[in-house]
Design a protein with these regions (language model features):
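Residue at a conserved register position within TPR or TPR-like alpha-solenoid repeats
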Residues: 233, 270, 302-303, 338
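Single conserved hydrophobic/aromatic residue that forms the stacking wall/gate
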Residues: 2-10
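Structural register within alpha-helical repeat arrays
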Residues: 229, 265-266, 298, 312, ...
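Structural motif corresponding to the intra-repeat A-B loop/turn of tetratricopeptide repeats
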Residues: 236, 273, 305-306, 341
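Acidic, Mg2+-coordinating catalytic module of metal-dependent nucleases/exonucleases
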Residues: 137, 143-219
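Short helix-capping/linker turns of helical repeat alpha-solenoids
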Residues: 258, 290-291
Length: 350
């Protein structure tokens, strides 16, 4: 076991954010921080096949006011059973797991190695928060690369020293070690794993604070980040927070396609609340910027809520002009409105 202690995190907001827990669905928001375990593995292969095993498991956790890191290293594959047994004993007191792609890679690999060694899986009841999925959701609109190292650079503004090595080199370095027994190159692997754990913990803390206090960040997030968080709020039925962030993202400036979509999403909430003036203002803003879907919403409003068929017809015509392809539904709506205006009584369903 290799341990690094005394990594201070006291100055950071240490809590399990309610929104972070809400997105995690099964994850409780009242977990003790001492029960949270950050995990990352380095393996003998990158594919995760039956012959792949973890030779280094990094674990991060809070011990009172300090964040500590312990690394379990497997010096020889034939010692895997005792390696896993020691690991199991160490993690038995934790009940929440935080990983980055751990649901798809690290945990299934660890479980399969336990099965091959006739051991019980180490996390049968632990709650699991995989930050990769949340990172993809929040930053897919402006970051093409959502790897942990990319998030370190672009979101956390952290940098690694020259000790670090690319992840793809790690399996071969370990295999070289097994042949030569020269452990000196492994120092870079230990550093890489240590930084992954520390970055994972930093990302966890940042996300918890960002999701609960998105407008109170020391570095103002990108407008696309506010938009993405607003969608997350909306999907978890935190509508007031969603509306606040939709407004902030529109004021911050968005690429036009995202701007129009945000106007529609924001207006939809107002429509559900029957706050027609605010909904109309957003639809009109989007319509003025060439959005046919908002024109259709305005046509529906004027026909069904106000009974102003001329306005409904006008907005339908504008929707047709802004649509780049022939839409039978719009043509049907146009003809129906013309018939109603001309006094015909034929009724068509929406």
């Amino acid at each position: 076991s290799y341990s690094v202690t005394g990594v201070q995190t006291c100055a950071l907001p240490i809590f399990f954010g309610q929104m972070l827990a809400s997105w995690g669905q099964a994850v409780s928001s009242n977990l003790s921080r001492q029960k949270i375990l950050f995990l990352d593995t380095e393996t003998s292969g990158l594919s995760g096949g039956s012959g792949t095993f973890a030779f280094l498991i990094g674990l991060g956790y809070w011990n009172d006011a300090e964040f500590e890191l312990t690394q379990f290293f497997l010096p020889h594959p034939e010692s895997e059973n005792s390696f896993l047994t020691a690991f199991d004993e160490f993690v038995s007191n934790f009940n929440c797991l935080v990983t980055f792609n751990g649901k798809s890679f690290d945990v299934p690999l660890i479980n399969s190695r336990h099965t091959l060694n006739r051991l019980q899986p180490p996390f049968p009841k632990a709650e699991h928060l995989d930050l990769l999925h949340l990172a993809r959701r929040l930053w897919r609109y402006r970051l093409t690369d959502r790897s942990l190292t990319s998030l370190e650079e672009n979101i956390l503004h952290l940098s690694r020293t020259q000790e670090d090595i690319p992840g793809w080199m790690i399996p071969q370095l370990y295999l070289d070690y097994l042949q030569t027994q020269d452990a000196r190159p492994l120092v870079n692997i230990f550093y890489h794993n240590e930084m992954d754990i520390l970055s994972l913990a930093a990302l966890f803390l940042y996300l918890g604070d960002l999701l609960e206090h998105p407008l109170q960040q020391p570095i103002q997030p990108h407008g696309l980040d506010w938009m993405a968080i607003a969608r997350l709020y909306e999907d978890t039925d935190h509508l007031e927070q969603a509306m606040t962030l939709y407004r902030a993202s529109l004021n911050a400036g968005l690429p036009m396609s995202f701007y129009l979509d945000t106007c529609r999403r924001f207006a939809k909430i107002y429509r559900q609340q029957r706050d027609w003036p605010n909904a109309i203002a957003l639809w009109q803003t989007a319509a003025e910027n060439g959005d046919p879907l908002s024109c259709i919403e305005l046509a529906k409003y004027y026909e069904h809520q106000v009974g102003d068929l001329d306005q409904a017809l006008s907005w339908t015509n504008q929707a047709i002009q802004q649509t780049k392809f022939s839409d039978p539904e719009l043509t049907k709506r146009l003809n129906r409105l013309k018939q109603k205006i001309s006094g015909k009584t034929t009724v068509f369903k929406e």
